[in-house]
């Protein structure tokens, strides 16, 4: 099995696949959600001031529910006692997502902390001294890439845990002076509620067996998540921004 994953529109291999590698099938799973960070956002308060009233009120409520959450930045040493629980939290989210092209090795995060500490970060979120969530990220120049997250789903509703994770990722991106944050796929609607917009990424797949390769498109179509969500436009000047992928 050969896979080329997550190429943006400008780097599509459509012509190359048609003439050079015709066995490769082009497909999309879900768009990635990207938020451009404005130059006048020096804090989360600055970001909130750019929101329409109802989204600003909602954000304050989310932050209020998350006041009891404490986070600790990890390095390769203090992470070791939490390695197993972090992987379990990741698996909870991964299994719930349904469709995954990859499955992480249990040592994945430890390895990144050991060898990529300048560009990779991971923070564990505690509630009443119990680790209930984590988020990770990669700093790629001026782009802040939200990486894998995990959380105890039973805490999500009462603490708005997932929404708080998104806001903490945003706060961290502002702190490191990033120009955009890539929130990745899944949970498209709630990510749009913090201002992210959809951008398609293209993947390519081929199998060495011609028989299997012939049914790959049908399998992928069956496994593809349903694209049923409403694009939110939280900013005061949202009507001035037009993205062809946005839904009304």
Residue ranges and their predicted role:
Residues 2-157, 213, 238-248:
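A conserved beta-strand-loop-helix scaffold within acyl/acetyltransferase catalytic domains
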Residues 59, 82, 163-164, 221:
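N-proximal short alpha-helices
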Residues 34-37, 44, 86-87, 104, ...:
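Broad hydrophobic/π-residue packing in well-ordered secondary structure
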Residues 87-88, 97, 184-248:
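C-terminal catalytic domain of photolyase/cryptochrome flavoproteins
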Residues 1-25, 143-206:
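Acyl-donor binding region in acyl/amide transferases
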């Amino acid at each position: 099995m050969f896979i080329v994953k997550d190429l943006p529109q400008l780097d599509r291999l459509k012509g190359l696949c048609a003439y050079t590698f015709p066995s490769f099938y082009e497909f999309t799973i879900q768009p990635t959600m990207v938020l451009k960070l404005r130059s006048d956002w020096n804090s989360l308060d600055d970001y909130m001031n750019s929101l329409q009233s109802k989204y600003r009120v909602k954000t304050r409520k989310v932050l209020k529910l998350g006041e009891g959450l404490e986070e600790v930045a990890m390095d390769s040493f203090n992470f070791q006692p939490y390695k197993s629980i972090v992987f379990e939290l990741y698996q909870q989210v991964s299994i719930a997502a349904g469709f995954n092209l990859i499955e992480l090795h249990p040592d994945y995060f430890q390895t990144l902390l050991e060898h990529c500490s300048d560009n990779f970060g991971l923070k564990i979120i505690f509630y009443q001294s119990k680790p209930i969530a984590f988020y990770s990220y990669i700093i790629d120049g001026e782009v802040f890439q939200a990486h894998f997250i995990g959380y105890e789903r039973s805490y999500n509703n009462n603490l708005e845990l997932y929404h708080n994770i998104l806001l903490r990722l945003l706060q961290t991106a502002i702190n490191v002076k990033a120009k955009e944050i890539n929130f990745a796929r899944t949970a498209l609607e709630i990510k749009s509620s913090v201002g992210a917009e959809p951008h398609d990424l293209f993947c390519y797949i081929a199998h060495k067996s011609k028989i299997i390769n012939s049914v790959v498109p049908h399998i992928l179509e069956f496994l593809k998540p349903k694209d049923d969500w409403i694009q939110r436009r939280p900013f005061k000047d949202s009507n001035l921004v037009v993205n062809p992928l946005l839904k009304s």
